[in-house]
Amino acid sequence: MSAVTSTTAYPTARSAAGPAPRPGGPATARRPSVRAAWYWERRKAPNRWYWPLTVVLCSLGALIGYMQYRDYQDAFEAQEATWEVVWAQSTLMLSMLFLPLAVAAFTAQAASGEHAGRNWQRMAANRLEGVMVVGKLLHALQAALFTALILVGEITATGLLLGFDAADLARYLPRVVPVTLAVWAIEVLVMWLGVVLESFAAMMTTVFLITVTGLALSLAAPALAAIDPMGLLTLACSSYSPRDIASLGSVLTASVVCLAWVGILALALRAGVRRRS
């Protein structure tokens, strides 16, 4: 997969607000536009392949959940287990490996373009690197929310297809929050790597090594998923603990852990941008 680069100048506050004042006119303060930065990040994101791939991956995960439930349906019905079984089986491999790598590739492709277009240097010259970071964080949060909605939507459709009670679904919907935050944390991690490393290949190699290492640790001790940012999606989905999927305490704990990672990585990203600039 080749990285898509962009050499288009990043929008500044002046370009977002309109033409510059005429010489001799009243002085006008240049205010960085977060909205323009957010819009620009959405515009240049590699959406053409990421969203179809996310739908396909979540569909495959949901298919695994469907088949697992049908294979052991009598045993699950005897335990009165429905949504939690499909949720856990659908998200296990998806959250451990495939979806985190897809999210990472989506973010790394955009990050590699910043170096090719020398966008960080241009933003530093205009003192807009802070606005650029905020725009990236907002776009990453938006993409994370849509990713979480696709995942939850496909699992919901699978459960309804199996005849589960739709009224019970409300207990599981709060999982959208930690899943969104987990995807966001992965994106911010890769954005930070994108400041330190310049090539798409270097970013994805590093991400893959982190993922494999974290996967081995989480299999040995599921609680260790909290210390691995690439493993946060498994923690957010509660894939190892199906009985806790509907637990608000579990949702809150996972959300706090993911949000803490977002904060730490966002600070690292900001510091990295300052050094790069």
Briefly describe each language-model feature range.
Residues 25, 49-51, 56-103, 107-109, ...:
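Secretory targeting signals
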Residues 31-39, 84, 130, 134, ...:
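Alpha-helical membrane-protein architecture signal
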Residues 109, 120-122:
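Glycine/small-residue-rich loop that forms an oxyanion/phosphate-binding "nest" at active or ligand-binding sites
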